[in-house]
């Protein structure tokens, strides 16, 4: 459980400038107001939430029976798994190398996978860019990711970006302190304000770290933002939570019904009640032999058995809930544990996944713009220039993504072959390798292998030409390869 913060205590921190107090107070208030709802959604994602029982069909002795439904996690992970960031591309080779280094030093691909799950859980996540201390082994630029449980921001509608933001950097992890925040960073257009609270103290102390970026070094990853909701919405919507509660209650009802259906209900007509009262309800329920005597009139009690109940209504209702959940989240119903008696065709499987693929394409487009701004901020911090100066160079930076449709290698190779036959010059482009599913690192290795193979072929041609005194093609290139080998 994550404890919140006290807005007034932080807004009156020692050393905090008067002109920044209202901004800090607003940020802390937003964080506190949204924390409970974000923790609730995290609870559904982690399957820690128990639904409210209706008190109709569940006996009191079984109302605490726990059932976990992973549908909210599936709603998040099914989309997150199709959003695979694969670095940046840039027409400027020097900038491309810088960005590759930044991505590698910050493990940004792995960090993005974590951030996108937080984004889909809570509607948004945040990336921050700060300068690292290279003297202690840190990278020149540090890119950090925070979920909405640890961060909040104020939106500037006119500039279409964050006006100011707050992140919880560190917490008190000692027992009985409930993860209380001890270090908070506030990001503004001119400064990073470190506000810390020493352990066992109630006073906060502010420290200013000015930067010359001219903008807040914090960027949101937002899912389905609208004009009214600039920070988007969660994949775990109210409908998802309600359906999950209903599914858990249905699962409990099915569990209870299954226990009663293991032995059909029996009855005795005309038996002495005192004889039956000697048996407990459980013994009467599971007992296979009844011993009863005739009544005073000499009549023998009539034994009977009720028709055994069916689990089909429970199965049908769970299938109905899964269909509604699938419609709400675009997750194929087959991924929710509902198996069809008739196998689906390849076309039907693709059609079921198409809405989720479209969601992933939209998600990648939105996150691609955010990651581009993060890349520009990282370059500005690394070069110690303003954000405007980096923009003035007009670097053509774009985020690169794996295909969210996740086609098979065979089908993708077949489609790319047809494209190359129609447009032959594409065969010389790296895009062909990317579309075939090769990662950025694999593309670089393939290009290195190709260059070495070309050099070896040129050397063989040179030696063959000397033996036969025949001129060789690409003599200038060959001389360059030989010179490079001598220098190496």
Predicted segments — roles?
Residues 338-345, 438, 442-456:
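Short linear loop/turn motifs
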Residues 447-488:
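Extended, compositionally biased alpha-helical segments that mediate assembly or anchoring
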Residues 113, 120-121, 126-234:
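Extended, regular secondary-structure scaffolds
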Residues 109-123, 127-128, 254-259, 310-409:
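C-terminal amphipathic alpha-helical
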Residues 406, 415-422, 426-446:
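Membrane-proximal bilayer-interacting regions
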Residues 1-145, 462, 478-488:
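Extended, helix-rich architectural segments
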